[in-house]
Amino acid sequence: MLSNVPPVLNQVNALVVVDNGSTACELAPWQAACKIHGFELIQNAENLGIAEALNQGVHWAQRRGFPWVLLFDQDSKITDGYLEAMFTSWKTHSDPDRVASMHPLYKDTAMGVEGVLRRAEDGGPIVAMTSGALMPTWIFDKIGMFRADYFVDEVDTEYCFRIRAAGYLLAVSPASVLLHHIGHPRKSSFLGLRFTPTHHSALRRYYMSRNRLVVYKKYIWIFPRWVLQSMKDSMVETAKCFLGEENRGRKLRNFLLGTWDGLRGRMGKRENL
C-alpha cells in the first residue's frame, strides 16, 4: 500500500493517511514514510470503520481550508494526470456548481476489466464508489458527513443517494482511471454456469446485508427505480456468494443476522461475528 503514496503526492497539495487499528509493527513503515514524504498519519487505536476514517480525513482537510478532498481506499491506485483530468471534467460540466462528487472510470486489476457505472438521466452515475472520488468540502457542510454507524459497506451508496436527494449531481471524468479490485474475485461454476464471486469475508457479509437493507428502506420511495435495480444487482451478487464461495455456512449466518439487524435498525460496529 505504501507504493500508492507517491503517485497521489505528486498530484495533490497535501495528503493524510488514516490508519484503523494497525499493530505497532504494521504502523512502523508508515511512520517512517510520513517523515520522508511529508504526509500526515492519523493513528486510530482500533478499527473505527471506513466511514469514520473518511470523516477524519475530511475534517483534517476542512480545518486546513482545503476546498476539495480526493478520497481513496488503501488498495486503489491512480494513473498519471488523474487529478488534472478530474478538474477539467468538472470545469467543462454543464452545471459545475451542482456537482458534489466527481468519479473516475474504474479498472478492476483482478479481472482486467473496466467497471461500468449505471448512469442517471443527467449523464452522471446513479451511485459510485467513494474511492477515487473528488469532492468539494462544502458538500459536507450542506448534507453532513459519511454515516459512521454503517461502519463499512454501502457507505458510498448511501452518500450518493443523499447527494442526489439534496438536488446535487454526480459526474464522471472519463480520462481519470482508478485501478482497484473488489473483494477477492475467483472464477467458479454451478451446474455448468460459470460466474465470478467476490469472495468477501463472512464479516463483510453481515455489513453488506444490513446496510443495503437500511439504504433501501430510506430511499425506496425517493428513487424507486434505482433502488429496485440495486436490489436486483445485490441479489445476483449474493446468489453468486452462496453458490460459489467457501465458508458458506458462516456467511449465510451473517447474511441473515445482518438482514435482521437492518430490519430493526441496529447499526454501528457489531462484535463477535
Task: Please report, for each region that a protein language model flagged, where it lies by residue.
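Short beta-strand-to-loop acidic/aromatic patch adjacent to the donor-nucleotide binding site
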Residues: 66-77
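A conserved acidic beta->alpha catalytic loop
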Residues: 19-28, 46, 76-77
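Short, well-formed alpha-helical segments that are part of the catalytic scaffolds
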Residues: 1-9
